[in-house]
Amino acid sequence: MDPQTLITKANKVSYYGNPTSKESWRYDWYQPSKVSSNVQQPQQQLGDMENNLEKYPFRYKTWLRNQEDEKNLQRESCEDILDLKEFDRRILKKSLMTSHTKGDTSKATGAPSANQGDEALSVDDIRGAVGNSEAIPGLSAGVNNDNTKESKDVKMN
């Protein structure tokens, strides 16, 4: 079989499929019917046959194809339709953007400056909480680490 034919068959209901074939689905409870080996009478209608079928005693949720028209569903149940633009994580909301850009920041580091007001922490506040760079050994530029070299040279008896 031609590879293009395989791709076309695989994509029948996907993005590349026929744009005119619209199907609507709903996530609902489903109770499967037991399959009987008895041959049904040919005069029986399909609806009657569904009503007479014996059902299994369990149900599960699954995606079911809607038999109703999609337009009728939209008119009846507006609360189930979500606007996906409201939940798009790529779009920042204005309220979030204003909270991050409220204070002035240092141009070089992007950290909030010490003269910022209200709720944001300044660089001095953060340094005070974790200790200055002198409080952490090895991070201070003025400290010389010659003591470690001397201790390595001492021989044990």
UniProtKB/Swiss-Prot annotation:
Lineage: Eukaryota, Fungi, Dikarya, Ascomycota, Saccharomycotina
Protein name per its UniProtKB record: Regulator of Ty1 transposition protein 102
Keyword Protein biosynthesis annotated: no
Role noted for this protein: Probable component of the chromatin structure-remodeling complex (RSC) which is involved in transcription regulation and nucleosome positioning. RSC is responsible for the transfer of a histone octamer from a nucleosome core particle to naked DNA. The reaction requires ATP and involves an activated RSC-nucleosome intermediate. Remodeling reaction also involves DNA translocation, DNA twist and conformational change.
GO cellular component: chromatin; nucleus; RSC-type complex; SWI/SNF complex
Residue span of region Disordered: 95-157
Gene behind this protein: RTT102
Domain of life: Eukaryota
Annotated organism of origin: Saccharomyces cerevisiae (strain ATCC 204508 / S288c)
One Pfam family in the UniProt entry: Rtt102p
GO BP annotations listed: chromatin remodeling; chromosome segregation; nucleosome disassembly; regulation of transcription by RNA polymerase II; transcription elongation by RNA polymerase II
